[in-house]
């Protein structure tokens, strides 16, 4: 029996050795796995952080592009409105010129007539209303008579001898000029001193 007992003990020891060896191997592998996994996780986190940063930059760039696009469209819309107003005013200017000529050529005899007074006042009122409308839209007359010639605002159509006037002084305005904001819609046509 002692042999049998001895053999059993050897088998038990052998199983314990196998179990111990098996138990040691996973412990070593377990210790190695977390280290490798931690390095992989750090690399993964770094890669994700870089990707997030890249996406953030892309979003910021797209937002800036959109803001620039929006501002450009606002400028274009404002410019389009200004150009439209400018074109309409250009078309109205001959009408205003005609009213001014009509008012300046009313004979004195007609002005003295009671029957003509409502007609004259009506023409003056129409001219006044036109000018008021243009002023509200930002249109202004260019001052000319008595000023020095400025090619940015005036167009000299002729020169005359004007005693007492300095050369290039505007002595007469032939046609009124107008501005819309900073832009000249029509240059004032003027006569200047030699």
Curated annotation (Swiss-Prot):
Q: Which GO terms describe its cellular component?
A: cytoplasm
Gene3D superfamilies attached to this UniProt entry: 3.90.20.20, Head domain of nucleotide exchange factor GrpE
Feature: compositional bias, Low complexity: 20-38
Spell out the molecular function terms from Gene Ontology.
Answer: adenyl-nucleotide exchange factor activity; protein homodimerization activity; protein-folding chaperone binding; unfolded protein binding
Domain of life the protein comes from: Bacteria
InterPro entries referenced in this protein's UniProt entry, alphabetically:
GrpE, GrpE_coiled_coil, GrpE_head
Ranges where the record places region Disordered: 1-40
> Which Gene Ontology BP terms does the record give?
protein folding
Q: CDD domains of this UniProt entry?
A: GrpE
Give the UniProt subcellular location, in the record's own words. Answer: Cytoplasm
Matches recorded under SUPFAM superfamilies: Coiled-coil domain of nucleotide exchange factor GrpE, Head domain of nucleotide exchange factor GrpE
The main location class comes to: cytoplasm
Q: Which keywords has UniProt assigned to this entry?
A: Chaperone, Cytoplasm, Stress response
Record function comment: Participates actively in the response to hyperosmotic and heat shock by preventing the aggregation of stress-denatured proteins, in association with DnaK and GrpE. It is the nucleotide exchange factor for DnaK and may function as a thermosensor. Unfolded proteins bind initially to DnaJ; upon interaction with the DnaJ-bound protein, DnaK hydrolyzes its bound ATP, resulting in the formation of a stable complex. GrpE releases ADP from DnaK; ATP binding to DnaK triggers the release of the substrate protein, thus completing the reaction cycle.
Similarity comment: Belongs to the GrpE family.
Under the subunit heading, UniProt states:
Homodimer.
Q: This protein is called what?
A: Protein GrpE
Q: Which gene encodes it?
A: grpE
